[in-house]
């Protein structure tokens, strides 16, 4: 078992891979960050990379020389199978934290050969790092990623999954979070709540996550869209996400639609004004999130 290190590991999709909030958190905590985010990935693929539902391979021969062997094809297999029987698609948008990886005790590189994430002709291959004896894999065998083997015992693990789907229902999503917590040897864990959607559309999700994880679940939507009222105590004049950046509520056009920040705040929706698009954060918003998370961690006696 790995010993806990003075570092932070964050797991997620493009909202994590894009960094900013996690690097700000690590900076304030005085710790090294290991960013386990990859764009476009759903919850199941992230859980597989982390190792909680590990990717597996069977019925292949790893040659003695340094030659790639096919692990799975996009067209016929759909992706790589996991221990729990799901199909996942790692590396479609990169992911340096996957390699070097191991199949059994053979160290090598897992590669996606497609021209882009949508290339249905792409395949996943494994190439051993050094020559050695030919190995026949005739039992289900784990594919262990670099971060699974080496960055799964952090002082703090942050899990931020679900924006791209990859779960059947809330029970399934909760189970995946708990699997990640159980698999890692993190001293502390924070669960980030999705920032997209409105208060009404996210109510069931947020209520369930709070029930399961308590104060260690932090809803980014709730914080960023939290209303600030005027002197009458009734009129919405701003929200935390705007005020923390010193911004006044305004409007923003996106895809031909104009969004009014105060109208969005009234529904518990993060204003487009502090987003790059409809989901991803501006640089200022990333800083707000990282600073807020550090303060929340201090309140939880993590830092």
Regions from the PLM with identified roles:
Residues 12, 37-40, 162, 285:
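Glycine-centered flexibility sites
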Residues 30-47:
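A short beta-strand-loop structural module common to alpha/beta enzyme folds
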């Amino acid at each position: 078992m790995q010993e806990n290190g003075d570092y932070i590991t964050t797991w997620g999709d493009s909202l994590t891979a894009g960094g900013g909030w996690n690097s700000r958190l690590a900076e304030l905590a005085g710790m090294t960050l290991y960013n386990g985010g990859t764009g476009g990935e759903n919850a199941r693929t992230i859980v597989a990379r982390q190792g909680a539902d590990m990717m597996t391979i069977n019925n292949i021969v790893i040659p003695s020389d340094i030659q790639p062997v096919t692990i799975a094809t996009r067209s016929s297999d759909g992706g790589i199978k996991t221990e729990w029987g799901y199909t996942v698609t790692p590396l479609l948008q990169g992911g340096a934290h996957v390699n070097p990886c191991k199949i059994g005790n053979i160290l090598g590189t897992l590669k996606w050969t497609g021209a882009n994430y949508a290339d249905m002709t792409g395949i996943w291959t494994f190439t051993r790092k050094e020559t050695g004896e030919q190995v026949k894999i005739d039992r289900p065998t784990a594919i262990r990623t670099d971060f699974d083997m080496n960055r799964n015992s952090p002082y703090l693990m942050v899990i931020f999954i679900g924006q791209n789907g990859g779960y059947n229902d809330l029970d399934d999503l909760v189970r995946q979070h708990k699997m990640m917590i159980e698999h890692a040897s993190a001293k502390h864990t924070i669960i980030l709540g999705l920032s997209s959607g409105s208060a009404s559309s996210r109510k069931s999700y947020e209520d369930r996550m709070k029930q399961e994880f308590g104060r260690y679940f932090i809803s980014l939507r709730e914080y960023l869209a939290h209303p600030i009222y005027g002197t009458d105590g009734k009129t919405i004049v701003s929200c935390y996400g705007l005020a923390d950046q010193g911004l006044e509520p305004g409007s923003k056009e996106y895809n031909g639609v104009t969004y009014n920040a105060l109208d969005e705040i009234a529904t518990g929706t993060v204003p487009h004004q502090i987003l790059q698009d409809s989901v991803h954060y501006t640089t200022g918003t990333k800083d707000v999130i990282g600073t807020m998370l550090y303060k929340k961690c201090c309140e939880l006696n993590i830092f």
